[in-house]
Every structure is written in C-alpha cells, then in structure tokens.
Amino acid sequence: SGDGIDSTSQNFAKALMRSGLDIFTHRHYPSRIRGGHTYVEIRAAGHEVQSRGDGYNFLLALGDSFARNPKEEAVYGDEEIKPLSENLDELREGGVIVYDSGLLEDDDVAELNLEERAEENDWHVFPIDLRGMAKEHGREVMRNTAGVGVTAALLEMDLEHIEDLMTDAMSGDVLEANLSILRDAYEMAQEEYEFEHEVRAPTGEHDEEQVLVSGSNA
C-alpha cells in the first residue's frame, strides 16, 4: 500500500482499453489505513466483460506491502512476500509470474515452493530486479513502471498507449525518467527472455468511444 499500485494499474487498464479491449477491474484494499497487502485485478477481452471472472493468467507482484511509519522508523509486520504468496492460488495453469527479485530474499521465495508449484501448473516465472532497474534510473518508486514495461513485453503489447497516458499525467524530468525505464524494461524483457508462455494480450476494436470509471463514479 502506498507504492503507486492504484495509479499504475489504472493506467495499464486504460492502455488496454485504448487498444480496443473491454475492461473490468477490481481493487482489493487492506483492512488498515496505511500499509498491508493490496492488489488490483484487471480483466481484458475483445468482447463485453461484465464481471471479475475466476482466476487470472498473469501475476505482476509489486511493492513490499509493509505497514510502516516513516517518521518513527517503525515497521509493523514483515509482509514483503505477500504480493507474491497471497495471489498464487488463483493463477491459472500456464500462467505467468513476474516478481521483483530485488525486493524478495531467495529464502522467502523458497518457502513458497514456487519452483515445484510452477512445474505442476506449467507456470512461467520471471524473477526480475525491478528495484535495481529503478535505482539505476534514479528513483526506486519507478520499479512499478519497470514492471509495466516487462508486462507489456511479455504480453506482446505496443507501448504507444502507455506512453501517451504517461505523457498526459507527467512532465519534465519525471516524465523522461519514467519513459526511459519503461522502454528499457520492455527491451530488456524482449532481448533476455524466451516467450514460451501462451498468455498474450487479446485484440479488439470498439464501435464507439469508451471511458473507464469506478462503480462509485458511475
């Protein structure tokens, strides 16, 4: 919580919508004001989507899920692993997992029996140091943007709509830094990994203009 998950997921959902897809999102909130495991589900299809659906095909584990008070330098509960551990059960056979190896210790990942479960379910796992990439570009919070770049590459999406949304929301050095890490992460994934998974972004086309709104605003 507090790591930009909401804005990152909303922009990714809008990019899918602008590419011609129908979108349905669901936001899970932790039961406390600051900190705790939070996640967003995005369902996208080339036909009308009216519900969340069951399970998902792609898991991007971001953030550290800490409950913390920076002023007191206090941390309430070590929950780094939750973005990965608490969402595995709903990942479908043949699904894709991207997690930030720069945030998670090998021992924590090993306790999940991820390797064995991946083999049993034909999951395709990509441990990528998103945190390290973000630090190289000057701001650790941009690991989310790096994650989006990797995700877009693995789904064989074009970056055009994502870049347009960033340009609408940012400016100056912040925009340039985010565009840079987005493109670098995208190209890194294309160059360094073999795409043996079958999960790809669907294709679609809208007959009329679309808008993405929350249930409250609707």
Regions found by a protein language model. Name each.
Residues 2-218:
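Active-site cofactor/cluster-binding pocket
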